[in-house]
């Protein structure tokens, strides 16, 4: 598992980044292993502020507001592929997370910032693997996968 983290958002002190990096690596690696049954994957994770994710959300999705997480898969699922993607080259894509949204949501949901940040990374990884939550059945499956990963790494609600 290779995770490249870009710390564009400077509200996370240098001395906290090491422990967060470990948790993020665990979460993403577990999501890949559970969903794609692989230990090998490459993901780029960028932590940004609300202004930057708002810009990206507007430019790439046509939604003119900030969001918590965006995922950009390097390979898109085609109609002749299985529902859950399995990449031979292991390059999954990019995940962008708003640190401001993660902090606010952690407060709203009554759990730690670390848990929320890792949850968003897991959520983004599952999108890279082909999961979605547009239909209720798909949403339930995605939530099961998210909770399984979070439970395995001990970051429960």
Swiss-Prot record:
List cofactor names only. Zn(2+)
Q: Which GO terms describe its cellular component?
A: cytoplasm
In the UniProt record, does the keyword 4Fe-4S occur? no
Q: Where in the cell is it found?
A: Cytoplasm
InterPro entries given in the database record: MetalPrtase_cat_dom_sf_prd, YbeY, YbeY_CS
Name the major location: cytoplasm
**Family per record:** Belongs to the endoribonuclease YbeY family.
This protein is called: Endoribonuclease YbeY
Which organism was this protein described from? Desulfitobacterium hafniense (strain DSM 10664 / DCB-2)
Gene (name only):
ybeY
